[in-house]
Structure formats: structure tokens, C-alpha cells
Amino acid sequence: MLRNFTLLIFVIFLSHCTNGNISNNCDVGSENYINSLLLRFVVKDRSYLCGYKVRIPACSLSYEETHLPENWIQVKQEVETQFALGSSGEETLIKYNTNTVAAVTGAASTAFQGALIAPNGNVYLLPYNSPKIVTINPITKNYESAATVPGNVDFIGGTLGPNGIIYLSPHTNNTFFKLDTSNNTLTNITSISMGGAAYNGGVYAPNGKIYYVPSGESTIRYYDTKKGTIGSVATPVSGGIFANGVLTPEGKIYFIPHTATNIHILDTFTESVTTIPFSFGGASNYISGIYTPNGRIYIIPYNASTVYYVDTKDNDKVVNAGTIPSAGTAMFNGVVLAPNGRLYPIPLNYANFISIDSNNSEIRVLMANPSTNSYRGGVIGQAGEIYLSPHSSNRFDLLDTKSIGSFCDSVRLSPYWNKF
């Protein structure tokens, strides 16, 4: 903020030092043009200047602006710039806190599902059976209890909305809650009578709405952060449970099928729902998805052996991206994009960690998974490390991806990737 204010004063000073000739306002070499350009950058004025539109660099945007379609070019450029820096070595698994999960939460097992980064810099581990929402300070690696919850799978996942507020996705609970991460206050939004296992995670869309991913419910519900109201999309989903939602720069949410067989697509600008004809087979075959800057949505297996991606730049063509080595059941739950350009599916019962190259889809087998039913979800840290959300694993772990680059705060917090 101080930097922008200083720059603004400098621009004003320059404008008063010019000779007042406005005939060359559109001459790119003129002082008037440069001053106007700098001023527009400081105040984030995106209107056209002499036929050109100012694009604010991704790292100068707020995270609430990164998922607006008009800003995708800058976000893509920033992410790909970090990708190009590559890795410094082989990944390592690190136990970053000596306390056990059971000691911290009081929950014997299946503590968390999902994690988010908040604007205060902390990692928020979202509850499954844990009676607490736990925060991790990435600098000190210390933990705190942010809020108390019933801890009976009331929620599965959550979404970071505007102003640092996390919206928890109701699963067995009929109440919609939000957590203000500025003061860790948990607030009841409203209650609605719903069936069991209602929703799995959510997505913060460019229209300001939090869309909840249907699980037991077929109705796509949303919370409008601008109006403070709960609403629903007219067209329901069908065919079974969806495990995850993926946002694209076109403002579309792709619901990843779990027991359902087809991907359903919600256009958040029209709130119309369409499907991709390709069958993923249901049977809990798939569990997660993630968007990559080349326009792909990688679909992460749960019980299936094949990894697919949806090419959103080629009419949503579904492409076979490879096979999981020694595939089993209940393999992964969640996936994280790292600054080295690799995807890291989060192992649940799979024997190892793996990585998938987002450019050529190469699958690499990494270190052993130290437990079973281990983790569900994770989130990227400031140095490219992934904080794992412990499910039955009784320890606090991070995966050091050895990324040379890093994502700035606005990208790390972006609704494209900071979700479950």
C-alpha cells in the first residue's frame, strides 16, 4: 500500500512538471502517456488507454480478483513463469510438528479432510471427525485451535471466499457455517433441511457466489457473498455423488464424478448445467480434479487405474493421461499444484506419493506413504511445500516439492487452486 501511494505521488509530481502539451498523450514515448499508464496501474484502472488496456500483474491483484476471466492472462503467465524454474532435487516428506494429531484434536482417527490457506498466512485444517478446526503457522510450524465444531462429519471441505472468510460445506449437518479467519469467529449462516451427506467442498466463482459440490443432494446450492443469501441453481445434477469442483477461467465449474458417471458443468454466468458424455464409470472411480494453465483438468483416481484429463481448449475432449503403477483401491483424496509444474495427488491408501507432470503427464513414484487411510487433501505453502491434511495419519507432515519458484500470495490463495 505504501509503495503504491509513493508511486502515485511520484506520478502526480511528474504530471505537474510537464509542459502541459496534450497533443502527444498517445505517444508511447511521451511523459504524458507514461504518467497516465503509471497512474492507471496504481489505481488498478483497467479502462482502455489509447486503444490499449492495462493489465495488472497477477501478484499485484488481490486473491479475490485472480479468478476473474479478464485477469486469467496475467495469472497464467505468473504460474508458468514459476513452472519454468523447475525443481532443485528430489521431493522429501517432513514431519514438521512433533505433536500427534490425537493429542491436538482429541479425535482418535479420521480427523481432517481438506486444507485451505487464509490471508493471514495460516493453514486451516478442516474437520472430518475432529472437534476442532486447527490452524498451522507455516513459519513457526506451531498450531492453534481456531474453532470448535461437533466433529461428526458435519462438514467435508470448505471454500475461501472474499475477505478471508471460509465457508464450510455441510455434509451431515443441515447448517451452513462461515469462519472469519481475521478473528477465527464461527458463525451460523442459516439452516436448511437436507438429506444426509449433502455436499463435498465448494468453489468460489467470479460472480461472488460460493457453489457447494453436490454429494447426497442433487441440488446445486450457493451462498451469495454479495447479498448474504442462500440460493440454488434451477437445474439439478444427476447420477450420483460428486467429489470435487474445478473452476476454469471461463467461469465454469466442472463437478468431478465419484459414484456419478459423467462430469457435470455449471456455467456460473448463466447457471446452466451441461454434461460431458464420456463415462468415468461411477463405482467411486475418481475423487479429485485440478486445473492447469494449459487448459487441462486432471482427474485423480480413487479406485480406477487410469488418469484422465479434460482438455477444456479442445471441446472438453477426455484424454488418457497414463496409468497409476500398481493401482489399488481408495488410493488418493485431493491433489495440489506445485510451483515446479507438477501435480501431487494426496495419498490415502496408495503405497506411495506420486507426481504428475502437468506438461507431459509423466507419472513419477516418490517416497512411501507412512500410514494407511493417511491424508485427505493438502495446500501449498510459501516455499512450494504441501501441508497435508491428516485423516488417520497421527502426525503432521508436509511434502517438500523442491520447487525453485514459488507462488505469490494472490496466486496461492486463488479460487482456482485454494479449495477442497
Positions of PLM-derived features:
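Bacterial Sec-dependent N-terminal signal peptides
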Residues: 14-60
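Surface loop/turn motifs at the tips and blade-to-blade linkers of beta-strand repeat domains
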Residues: 65-67, 104-108, 147-151, 190-194, ...
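Repeated scaffold domains used in trafficking and secretory/extracellular systems
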Residues: 69-77, 109-116, 152-159, 196-203, ...
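Conserved beta-propeller blade signature
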Residues: 82-85, 123-125, 166-168, 210-212, ...
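Short loop/turn segments immediately following the C-termini of beta-strands
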Residues: 87-88, 128, 171, 215, ...
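Short loop/turn segments that connect beta-strands within beta-propeller blades
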Residues: 96-99, 137-141, 180-184, 224-228, ...
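Blade-level signature of beta-propeller repeat domains, shared across WD40, Kelch, NHL, RCC1
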Residues: 376-420
